[in-house]
Amino acid sequence: MTKQPFYKSLYVQVLVAIAIGIALGHWYPETAVAMKPFGDGFVKLIKMAIAPIIFCTVVTGIAGMQSMKSVGKTGGMALLYFEVVSTVALIIGLVVVNVVQPGAGMHVDPNTLDTSKIAAYAAAGEKQSTVDFLMNVIPGTVVGAFANGDILQVLFFSVLFGYALHRLGSYGKPVFEFIERVSHVMFNIINVIMKVAPIGAFGAMAFTIGAYGVGSLVQLGQLMLCFYITCILFVLIVLGGIARAHGFSILRFIRYIREELLIVLGTSSSESALPRMIDKMEKLGCNKSVVGLVIPTGYSFNLDGTSIYLTMAAVFIAQATDTPMDITHQITLLLVLLIASKGAAGVTGSGFIVLAATLSAVGHLPVAGLALILGIDRFMSEARALTNLVGNGVATVVVSKWCKQLDEGTLQRELAGEGNASSPASDIPVGGREAV
């Protein structure tokens, strides 16, 4: 197979686009801010296809299973993994921010902060509750779930649909085959959309640098640096340890999903890579049914980067405003976040809304303190989204192995770069899910 020129690689194209976006934002900020529609448009194109892809993947995965017991086992193991790892992430964030104390010495009076820009986040945060979150999983209408692009609602309906289709046996086979064909079409659409990924990454990065400026980061740089280093160490040590214990290298895995990571870096949303992650994890040897359950569910229940951010940001606000936080307050914060963090979907800005909800729920911390980190939240969202993406990928491999639904030979070949670059479904008609 002839190797394509390096400049045709999506990885290289997105990397160059991000670099150009940063340069434009730094030297021509007004022009860069006008590039925002390119980034927004790309994210909207991706989100357009997410709901049908989740539906097709989950339905064909569940309906094609030999036994429904496998679905329950997969879901249970996934939730167990999510709860343990996200709790570890919350604790790590809490420990690091207490040791480094990036907010100490700022002596900010919450009453002097401009809260006008955080009013919408605070209002959205106050509406967050565990009961509302659980009730929101059930869609008011099926059409509404797809129209709004609510991942958990689409997943809920997809599981029910797949279960019902499985019960029909051979009578439901025509429906199963039709949905499988629709799945191939949807992944083809994603392949087409991904051709404009460099433009989307350029627009999003240019806007970010142009709107906020690199210079504005200096004052709060200690928190950002602390957060970025913590995320890197979490990926390499915690996720790396989990990966090593399950027979694969975290560095090779990161290299395997490098294109998806760059797309996320450009858009600041791990959701923008969701369709390709589903495809990539299947190619890696994970069973389709496991991928269909773990990846979408992980976008609400396994956001490791967001978990680290939430504890660090909350305690940073306390330190900066000289709000005392003893061990009881910090344990309360941790318990609140164990619940609240599950509502942080993988979209830009959701982590900030959950942080607002947490400050409101704890009551001890000034919600006005959100204004302190509003300016740098956009820059920290890259590290959150990247960590979330790697975390969900590792979770998929681990749960697949636990459920004995992992082809370990394929896993090692793909991570070593020896796998077939085309889709695992070699019988897909022309235009199938080939690698971009």
From Swiss-Prot:
Reported phenotype of the disruption mutant: Inactivation of the gene causes a growth defect in minimal media supplemented with succinate, fumarate or malate. The dctA-dctPQM double mutant shows no growth on malate and fumarate and residual growth on succinate.
Alphabetized Pfam families for the sequence: SDF
Alphabetized GO MF terms: fumarate transmembrane transporter activity; malate:proton symporter activity; succinate transmembrane transporter activity
GO biological process, alphabetically ordered: C4-dicarboxylate transport; dicarboxylic acid transport; L-aspartate transmembrane transport
Residues annotated as transmembrane: 14-34, 45-65, 77-97, 142-162, 198-218, 223-243, 290-310, 331-351, 353-373
Gene3D superfamilies listed in its UniProt record: Sodium:dicarboxylate symporter
Region (Disordered): 414-436
Record's signal peptide: none
Membrane topology: Multi-pass membrane protein
GO cellular component: plasma membrane
Induction and repression of expression: Expression is maximal in early exponential growth phase and declines with cell density to reach a plateau in the stationary growth phase. Induced by the C(4)-dicarboxylates succinate, fumarate and malate. Positively regulated by RpoN and the DctB/DctD two-component system. Negatively autoregulated.
Cell location: Cell inner membrane
Entry keyword set: Cell inner membrane, Cell membrane, Membrane, Symport, Transmembrane, Transmembrane helix, Transport
Top-level taxon in the UniProt lineage: Bacteria
Family affiliation: Belongs to the dicarboxylate/amino acid:cation symporter (DAACS) (TC 2.A.23) family.
NCBIfam families listed in its UniProt record: PRK01663.1, PRK13027.1
Described purpose of this protein according to its UniProt entry: Responsible for the transport of dicarboxylates such as succinate, fumarate, and malate from the periplasm across the inner membrane.
Protein name in UniProt: C4-dicarboxylate transport protein 2
Taxonomic lineage: Bacteria, Pseudomonadati, Pseudomonadota, Gammaproteobacteria, Pseudomonadales
